[in-house]
Each structure stands twice: as C-alpha cells, then as structure tokens.
Amino acid sequence: MKKIIGALSLVLLIGCSLSGNRKNDACNHSEWYGYVNICLPTIDGMKECRLHPRVQAFTQKYRESGPLLGYYLNDKTYQRIDSLGTFSFDNYFMLYGDYNRENYEATATDLPLMQQQLEQSLVGTNWQERGRQVEDVYNTLMIGQPAIIEKYSPCSDVLTMIVLMKYRQENGQESTVISAANCILVKKRLLNMAYYMAYDGGKTIDLLKERNDGAVQKLMQLNQ
C-alpha cells in the first residue's frame, strides 16, 4: 500500500530483560536521533533500506515532521525496490521520530501521553473500550475513520495500539489495513514504530502482533 498499540505479557517482559542481558545481537546498523545513537534490529524476512534513493523519495512526506530511522520491506517487495511508488504493497515497518522531541529526555510517564496524542491524531474510535468484536468493527468500518481494536504493552517501555483502517486506492478500489502503532521509550528518547499489513480476517491480527512484538523486543534488546 502506497500511502500509508490489553494486557501486559509477563513472558514477553521477562524475555526482553533476559535477552537484553545476553547481548546476542551486535549493533551492526544504527542511526542518530538527536544526540542519541539508536541501534537498528534485524527483522527476519525483511531488509532495512531507509537510505535507498527510492525509499528516500517515497518517504519524503513522512520525513518532513521527523527523521526516518528505519524502513523495512519484506524480501518480496525489496526485489522491486527500484520501482517503489508505482505499485501497492504491505508488510513493512517504519521506525521514526519527531523533530520537536529528538533531544527531549523522556521518562516512562511520558509514554501514556504520547499514546494519547497519537490516538487523538487518528480521530478514530476505540472499539476495545466499547466491547465490540473485530469482525463487527470491520463490517461497519468507514473510509478515513480508523478503529482502535486493542491496546497493550508487548514489552517494558512500549505501548502498542492495533488499528484497523479502510482507505481508497488511486484506482478507486477499497482496501483495509491493520497496523501496530508502537510508542517507544528507548535511551530516554520517544520513538514511533509502525507495522502495516493488509487485513484478511482475524488471523491477520494474530500474525501482525507476533511479528510486531518480536521486532519491538529486538529493538529494545539492542538498545539496553
């Protein structure tokens, strides 16, 4: 696609802590965010390609409000990277910041406010609070009106929203996207990490959360 955060899991929390202590992953790739160097994780089946000229051109509008620290395409899409922007795609990650807070020393108390601001910017409806089922939400979803399906914390210092959104493609066809919008506190800095997939029923949400949570954990482990 061209244009285009439940309950705390003790198992994941322990996993973040223990894995971070093992230091299994080297910081082979990193990007500066203000005065802080952020290590970029490797994600299975994906290529990090933020510096590719086509990615730079494709993400120009995102970079007007903040730096793009990481951009991950799956292997299949990466094979067509030279024509990025001429076809629709999904299954990609974005790690980005905000110029207004890149040198702000944040604490854990800033995370809920950050998530609240993100939720307000979506101008969506929190269906989790209303007790609606996902398929019920999907059947009543309107273009340009995102629905927040779930909120949870996959790891310490991370708040995640699962967002369902319908939009109209340039050819007039309607598409539905499910995304994980992560608010992250790492090295006293606030970052966003988003993962997008085409929605294909409830199973898509489980897969999205599995992949998203794994990538977020790797990011936190590398930046302990």
Residue ranges and their predicted role:
Residues K188-Q224:
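Surface-exposed amphipathic alpha-helical segments
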Residues E170, A181, D213-V216:
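Core RNA-modification/binding signature centered on pseudouridine synthases
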Residues K2-L10:
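Sec-dependent signal peptide recognition
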Residues I14-G15:
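C-terminal motif of bacterial Sec signal peptides marking the signal peptidase cleavage site
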Residues T42-D44, H52-R54, V163-Y167, Y195-M197:
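A mature extracytoplasmic/lumenal domain signature
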Residues Q60-N171, T176:
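Conserved polar/disulfide-associated segments of primarily extracytoplasmic proteins
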Residues S175-V186:
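Short, surface-exposed beta-strand/loop micro-motifs that present aromatic residues
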Residues R22-L68:
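Start-of-domain marker
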